[in-house]
Every structure is written in structure tokens, then in C-alpha cells.
């Protein structure tokens, strides 16, 4: 059975291994991307702060992906970042990404953010399709300073225009 829930302290090791495995599978550079983030090894602690939350996708007791929301680093204003949204290949194309996105957007609204920002890789076409279907638009350049200089695709969603 599939479950999407908030990250727990006991998830850290398995979640880090899962996310790094997905990043390697996708051919993501190890420098200038989420792969190098120290936060990957302590996701519970990273998101156990105000205005932040990370959700994990669990199937049959195994962590198969996740996504989170946190304030956009080095940016003033009510803007959050959709972070580290990765799903195991075994679950792609089954609507799990849409469910995970909805959990994140619901949290962003509850936290009173007005916009959601994301950075991604140009070859992650399926992810970009999900982002567009979820109301994200392409923007010309980065916002804030996420440290992900190798991610050249930038997108933004206005939460105030949602139905």
C-alpha cells in the first residue's frame, strides 16, 4: 500500500540513499545540485523547522521518493521552494508525483506562502510536465540562492491564482 507522510527521524539513512540513487539514475551532476546537499543525510532535522515540511513516499515499508517545501533561501518575501522532489522509477507515471505535489502545495498554502519556486534540469521533461500541469510557469532566471548552480531551469507558481 502506498502512503505519503511527513519524514520521520528514522527515515534519514534510507531516504538519503534513495534520493541519491534516483539522482544517479537520472544523470544529475554531483556538484551544484541536490546530490551534494548535506541536508540529504539529515532530512528530518532539515525540515523540522517552522515553515518547512518534507514528505516521503512509502510503499510496502520502503521509501521510494519524496518532496518538500521550505522558505526560498536568500530571498525576501512569502516565497517557498519545492525541494528535492524525486520519485523512484517504479512509481513514475502512476499519479504519485501529482499526489506528492498536492501535499506540498497544500502545506505551502497553510504556511501562507504566496509563490512556489523550483529549479530542475532541462532533461527532466516528465517532471516539468507535472510542474506545468500543477500551475508552474517558466521564468527567465533563478530566484534566491539555492546553491544549485547546475540547475538551469527555473519555474514559479502563484498560489493566489489557484481555484
Task: Annotate each language-model stretch with its function.
Residues 21, 114-117, 121-134, 138-163:
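C-terminal "cap" of GNAT-fold acetyltransferases
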Residues 62, 75-76, 84-102, 110-111, ...:
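Conserved glycine-rich acetyl-CoA-binding loop
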Residues 13, 94, 153:
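Glycine-centered loop/turn positions within well-structured domains
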Residues 32, 41-44, 51-52, 83, ...:
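Generic intrinsically disordered, low-complexity segments enriched for polar/acidic and small residues
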Residues 2, 6-83, 88-89, 101-103, ...:
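Acetyl-CoA-dependent GNAT
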